[in-house]
Amino acid sequence: MALVVKGKVNINEFIDLSKSEKLLPSMFTPVKSVMVSKVDKIMVHKNESLSEVNLLKGVKLIEGGYVWLVGLVVSGEWNLPDNCRGGVSVCMVDKRMERADEATLGSYYTAAAKKRFQFKVVPNYGITTKDAKKNIWQVLVNIKNVKMSAGYCPLSLEFVSVCIVYKNNIKLGLREKVTSVKDGGPMELSEEVVDEFMENVPMSVRLAKFRTKPSKRGPKNNNNLGKGRSGGRPKPKSFDEVEKEFDNLIEDEAETSVADSDSY
């Protein structure tokens, strides 16, 4: 069965265009060219994967110009029988950013029992046409507790974006026109579904772990480290220890930012 975005992508959900901006020629308005991309599709075969996704598929870019990624609609469908256990985390990533917490644009968690799902992310930032041609966006997928034999596809994802292309730096004021944007870092979108699935590792931590390659060097000989002196250098913490501390911090202090989501 083909996976489709529910209805037509509504630009007004992401950009609040005035009547004059809809009617006047582009030279008289700050908004030059609003476009909706073609659908890009990913078939998920592995429990954990980091795949490139073309969020500007079919968008006509301006040479030497810019593109502003305003909004993104992600649709998913489980290719499973009804009432299966488990779930998935889907995280949008800007691969240019080296710090994992800054690379994550938004994440979404849902159970496999919910056969179809759809959510929206509002990245609200611009890049150069040159960078856009390098296909800088990725999707990190983590499927948990779904028991399917290797080689099959438990989940399909599709992506459609709303963007603005322009030749020169866009006029001040457009940011204020983009709706549903909140301060406070990456958005975390969450479904209120109770199943045998629970996301317990922040997606930025999971991305950092996924990006890290095992060291080819052997362990250092630290037998004499700190002996005979009280001011020895402390032993570096393992990833699991840092991850545990991060989880405790999230539970104690962090507050999940809920953005618009739509399921069908």
From Swiss-Prot:
GO terms for molecular function: RNA binding. One of its GO terms (biological process) is transport of virus in host, cell to cell. The keyword RNA-binding applies. It comes from Tomato mosaic virus (strain LII) (ToMV). InterPro entries: TMV_movement, Viral_movement. It is found in: Host cytoplasm, Host cytoskeleton; Host cell junction, Host plasmodesma. Keywords: Host cell junction, Host cytoplasm, Host cytoskeleton, RNA-binding, Transport, Viral movement protein. This is Movement protein. Residues 237-247 have a biased composition (Basic and acidic residues). Belongs to the tobamovirus movement protein family. Pfam families: MP. Residues 210-264 are annotated as: Disordered. The keyword Transport applies. Residues 210-219 have a biased composition (Basic residues). One of its GO terms (cellular component) is host cell plasmodesma. It comes from the Viruses. Its main location: host cell. Transports viral genome to neighboring plant cells directly through plasmosdesmata, without any budding. The movement protein allows efficient cell to cell propagation, by bypassing the host cell wall barrier. Forms a ribonucleoprotein complex with viral RNA. Binds microtubules and modulates microtubule stability. Can bind double-stranded DNA. Triggers host hypersensitive defense reaction in incompatible plants harboring resistance (R) proteins. Binds to host RBCS at the plasmodesmata; this interaction seems required for viral systemic movement. In resistant plants, interacts with host MBP2C at host microtubules; this interaction prevents virus cell to cell movement. In resistant plants, interacts with host resistance (R) protein (e.g. tomato ToMV resistance protein TM-2(2), AC Q71BG9) at the host plasma membrane; this interaction triggers host defense responses leading to programmed cell death.
